[in-house]
């Protein structure tokens, strides 16, 4: 089970976008995540007529390491650490360590 999943709201804890909040768009296998409108770079792209892509300079989201993001706790209004626990029915769920609230209902 992963600490950060697709669709989670996260806060960036390090780097040029420190303190910004966004939603995880994609989780990569090498412990990196792509966060919406975070770590934007300008990419020079050639036109590709077969795929219908125009050329030019485009803004693109680049992945950041999972250690540089924290899951956003809406009850506290800030980032929080995540742990795992097993419920009585045998399900393994994520929870916020500061207030023991379950993330996955």
Swiss-Prot record:
MF term (GO), any: structural constituent of ribosome
GO cellular component, one term: ribosome
UniProt keyword terms in alphabetical order: Ribonucleoprotein, Ribosomal protein, RNA-binding, rRNA-binding
Keyword RNA-binding: yes
4Fe-4S in keyword set: no
Signal peptide positions (record): none
GO biological process, one term: translation
Top-level division of the source organism's lineage: Bacteria
Pfam families: KOW, ribosomal_L24
Function according to Swiss-Prot or TrEMBL: One of two assembly initiator proteins, it binds directly to the 5'-end of the 23S rRNA, where it nucleates assembly of the 50S subunit.
Family per similarity comment: Belongs to the universal ribosomal protein uL24 family.
Assembly information from the UniProt record: Part of the 50S ribosomal subunit.
Name of the protein this chain belongs to: Large ribosomal subunit protein uL24
Gene responsible for this protein: rplX
């Amino acid at each position: 089970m992963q600490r950060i999943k697709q669709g989670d709201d996260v806060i960036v804890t390090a780097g040029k976008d420190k303190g910004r909040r966004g939603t995880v768009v994609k989780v990569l296998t090498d412990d990196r995540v792509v966060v919406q409108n975070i770590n934007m770079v300008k990419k020079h792209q050639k036109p590709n007529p077969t795929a219908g892509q125009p050329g030019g300079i485009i803004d693109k989201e680049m992945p950041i390491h999972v250690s540089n993001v924290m899951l956003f706790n809406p009850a506290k209004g800030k980032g929080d650490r995540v742990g795992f626990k097993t419920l009585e029915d045998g399900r393994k769920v994520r929870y916020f360590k500061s207030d023991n609230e379950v993330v996955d209902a």
